[in-house]
Every structure is written in structure tokens, then in C-alpha cells.
């Protein structure tokens, strides 16, 4: 269960203000959460005013500009810049999304950027994903089969069976959905959350997997699965347009069928 008493250093204070010295054609203020555990200080919100006429169109472009030209200590994850790797997931203007595909022009007023909520912060905009990945490992995300591996071909799958994986395999494990889920906020130590459960259903739905029963038994738990209350935050925030709530519903239906319900 989540700890309800906030530690003293959880209070976010006003930080430094940075402004470009040259005249700006399209000035824009970006407020960024800053936290360094090595400094033993409270988190702060630093303000950066940049010229949008001299940067790219996405939030990640602005962050890179700030890091390269204003404050090299700003810390965040990024890699592909194409919405594929999930590294740059963060909370932007109150919504969990990917910085690399979030247009600056979609946001009115000051831009507010925080790390993904309800995760320990490693530094600045970098969340600790260790627990999330441990939960992913727990569902055994690989084909489990007792049949021998074909000697001269892959494990074949019909087009119809392959289509059952659409809307599942595209998940990039960015954790935007799980960290937008109130049930995961309060029970993240036991509840697997929408991202991991969508991944679990991806293997349950795979016709090449022979361990559907075993997988369903592992998920049939008051906390692992049934903390989902169909709030739908996960589906609303997914940057890939997936529907984790639907996948969770299908898992629940399969378990009910096993019990003749």
C-alpha cells in the first residue's frame, strides 16, 4: 500500500530562472522539475525562457536545447526521437506522454514538465523503472511451449491468429499508462498495472504459446489483476493509441470462463 505521509523533502520549492540574453522572436517559458538526491535538498521548479524560433517543434527539442545551451546538468532520458523506444516518457502539461512526439504548439501558456508520477526519481526527469521492469519479468514475456522447436522453420502462425496481436505488440513499455492509473498509485507494490497486464495478454493471445492456463492462474489474484477498476486513464494517455483496459477486460473474461461463469 502507498505511504500516505509525505517526507519533508517532498515539498517542491521555487528554483532558478534562466533566460536567453539575446532578443527572442518567439519567447516561451518552460518550467521543469529538478531533483538531485545527492544534494539532500528539496525538489525545485526551474524556469527556462527559450526562443522557439531557434528550436525544433517537439518538447524533446526544447529539453535538448536547454541542456546543450543553458544548463548541462538537466537530466532526462531520450533515444529514438520517434516515439518508438519510450525512453522520454514524462508528465507534460499534466499528461503522461512522450516528449519526442509532443508538439510544443499543442500547449498554451507556460509549459510544465515533471517526471512520471508516483515513481521514485533518480534525478530530475528520470524515474526509477526498476520495479516496473521487475513486474514485467514476472509475467514471463516470452513464448512458453512444450512442443519441440521446428528444425527448419519458424513457429508458423496464421494471418488470422497474427491479427489477434494487433494493439498489443506495439506497446513500448514507456509506463505512461501505469503511472496515470490511480489503482497503480496506491497498490503499485502488488497490482501489475495496465502496461504489464497488456503485455501479459499479448502472450495469452499468442497462438504459438501453449501455457495459457498457467499464465491465467498466475494472474488470478486480488491485487495483481483485480485492482483494475476500469478508470480508463491508461487508454486515454497511451501515446501509441493502445487500449490496456480492453486487454485487462479480456483477461478477466478468460478467467471467468475457466470457472464456468
From Swiss-Prot:
Transmembrane segments: none annotated. GO terms for biological process: respiratory electron transport chain; tricarboxylic acid cycle. [4Fe-4S] cluster binds at residues 171, 174, 177, 238. This is Succinate dehydrogenase iron-sulfur subunit. Residues 28-119 form the 2Fe-2S ferredoxin-type domain. Pathway: Carbohydrate metabolism; tricarboxylic acid cycle; fumarate from succinate (bacterial route): step 1/1. Residues 161-191 form the 4Fe-4S ferredoxin-type domain. Keywords: 2Fe-2S, 3Fe-4S, 4Fe-4S, Electron transport, Iron, Iron-sulfur, Metal-binding, Oxidoreductase, Transport, Tricarboxylic acid cycle. Residues 1-22 are annotated as: Disordered. Belongs to the succinate dehydrogenase/fumarate reductase iron-sulfur protein family. It comes from the Bacteria. It is an enzyme of class 1 (oxidoreductase). Its cofactor is [2Fe-2S] cluster; [3Fe-4S] cluster; [4Fe-4S] cluster. A ubiquinone binds at residue 186. It catalyses: a quinone + succinate = fumarate + a quinol. Pfam families: Fer2_3, Fer4_17. Its EC number is 1.3.5.1. GO terms for molecular function: 2 iron, 2 sulfur cluster binding; 3 iron, 4 sulfur cluster binding; 4 iron, 4 sulfur cluster binding; electron transfer activity; metal ion binding; succinate dehydrogenase (quinone) activity. Binds 1 [2Fe-2S] cluster. [2Fe-2S] cluster binds at residues 80, 85, 100. The keyword Iron applies.
Amino acid at each position: 500500500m502507498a505511504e500516505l505521509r509525505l517526507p519533508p523533502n517532498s515539498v517542491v520549492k521555487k528554483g532558478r530562472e534562466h533566460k536567453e540574453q539575446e532578443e527572442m522572436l518567439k519567447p516561451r517559458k518552460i518550467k521543469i522539475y529538478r531533483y538531485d538526491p545527492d544534494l539532500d535538498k528539496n525538489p525545485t521548479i526551474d524556469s527556462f525562457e527559450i526562443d522557439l524560433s531557434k528550436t525544433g517543434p517537439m518538447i524533446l527539442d526544447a529539453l535538448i536545447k536547454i541542456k546543450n545551451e543553458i544548463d548541462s546538468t538537466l537530466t532526462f532520458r531520450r533515444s529514438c526521437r520517434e516515439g518508438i523506444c519510450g525512453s522520454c516518457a514524462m508528465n507534460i502539461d499534466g499528461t503522461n506522454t512522450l516528449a519526442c512526439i509532443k508538439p510544443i504548439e499543442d500547449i498554451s501558456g507556460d509549459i510544465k514538465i515533471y517526471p512520471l508520477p508516483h515513481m521514485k526519481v533518480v534525478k530530475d526527469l528520470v524515474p526509477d523503472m526498476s520495479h516496473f521492469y521487475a513486474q514485467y519479468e514476472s509475467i514471463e514475456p516470452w513464448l512458453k511451449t512444450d512442443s519441440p522447436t521446428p528444425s527448419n522453420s519458424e513457429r508458423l502462425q496464421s494471418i488470422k491468429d497474427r491479427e489477434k496481436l494487433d494493439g498489443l505488440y506495439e506497446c513500448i513499455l514507456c509506463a505512461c499508462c501505469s503511472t496515470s492509473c490511480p489503482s497503480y498509485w496506491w497498490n503499485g507494490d502488488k497490482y501489475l498495472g495496465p502496461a504489464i497486464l497488456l503485455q501479459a495478454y499479448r502472450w495469452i493471445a499468442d497462438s504459438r504459446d501453449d501455457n495459457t492456463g498457467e499464465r491465467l492462474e498466475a494472474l488470478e489474484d486480488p491485487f495483481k489483476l483485480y485492482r483494475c477498476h476500469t478508470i480508463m486513464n491508461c487508454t486515454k494517455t497511451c501515446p501509441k493509441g493502445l487500449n490496456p483496459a480492453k486487454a485487462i477486460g479480456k483477461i478477466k473474461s478468460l478467467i471467468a470462463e475457466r470457472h464456468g461463469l
